[in-house]
């Protein structure tokens, strides 16, 4: 049945994209006079083409194939970095060619890899602007295109192997080509132009030169970076700063994960890690990690290290950086308070390279971020520890899930989780269906149930395509007793999916699952009786507006 439904939706997508492009071609608007912009460009010594690396596209993306042994598929390599020149496209903004980069990502539905292409430009948003981007196929013949999220209201015109779209505001724009094929995605990040010299000078005036560490454009290699008990510290990665993690330990099987210990690591983090994260902050206050640089962990083996980790920290600000191909959990906030994350992008193809994991933290905002990873993308957890998870808000974020879940409460609920918001965000694709009682696009899934969940809002979220469940609320631990999931609200949610959304408790009537549905739309049409769209299990209180 699911295969038939998928066929129908695939046919519907193909037909609608084709007809829309044929019958209602997009309008290309006049550009602003003297439109001024700059673009992200990485140093030549960091970025090489596939040809220069002696690789074909198939050889590179084949490294992510699930047909390989797990620790080979997610292993590291050093013959090419995690960002390369995209072989798929060239791009122009206002007639000027801009770099198109690419990183390996994972497609779960086919258990294989592909390249996700991207560019980034900087504009002055204090002035009205309009520009046209032209994307021309190189290895890919372009026949039609759709621009996501649909809420941007941007349409694409395809003619003679070139796609053109008019853009007039900052944001993250993802182009799907050839009947919304997820193999050849391209994302344009349009972000605010900044004066790096001015920003750095202001930080030096505020904190002193010794407390402002600047990495200029260039390549930097570290075994790991360990920062303990720092206060009022700024780490500034200028545009084009390329930070590489050195591979030290061969992790070829699960036994190897515990084979290599770094003796002082356990005392320098609060999460129980026996090897340092690649960038580790512990017991720090008023910390800023920012700039248009990249943190690339492609050389590390599976689970050799975690990515960027903050534990027991206060007043944390992270902005503008890109995190590439972490071997495990890309970004972690654990037992932290007052955390701001803005304009951070995470791309990765390995299993367990979760995107943004906010754990046991208070007063956290995640805004304007993009993640395409082979695991959970934007998640809240409550692990063991003294703190619960409270007052955490995600806004204007874009998720592309190549394996598991996109937005929500995922797995560990060992303390109370409360006052969580996911708003004004979008799912491009989510294609994992390996356990449809555990994964989905928007989820509240409790696998460990020592705590409780009270107050989760999903609002104004669009899901372009989900191969499984678009919404899942589930007590996954069937042995749970006296566990509460309450005050969960789904408001103004639109989706297209191959399975029904689901809300389910357990056989025990001691557990509570309470959900409100308010404004649910499928395939672009708001439904009058949203409860009828859902599979609803035992001991669930579901209301609808």
Regions found by a protein language model. Name each.
Residues 13-21, 235:
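Hydrophobic core
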Residues 18-31:
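Sec-dependent signal peptide cleavage junction
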Residues 33-202:
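Beta-strand-enriched, solvent-exposed domains that form extended recognition/catalytic surfaces
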Residues 165-167, 220-234, 244-288, 298-315, ...:
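Extracellular beta-strand-rich solenoid/capping regions of secreted or surface-exposed proteins
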Residues 192-234, 244:
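Acidic Gly/Asp/Thr-rich repetitive segments characteristic of extracellular carbohydrate-active
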Residues 223-226, 245-248, 298-306, 327-333, ...:
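Short glycine/acidic-rich loop motifs that flank beta-strands on beta-rich extracellular proteins
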Residues 232-234, 239, 285-296, 314-325, ...:
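Right-handed parallel beta-helix
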Residues 413, 432-545:
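Extracellular beta-rich repeat passengers
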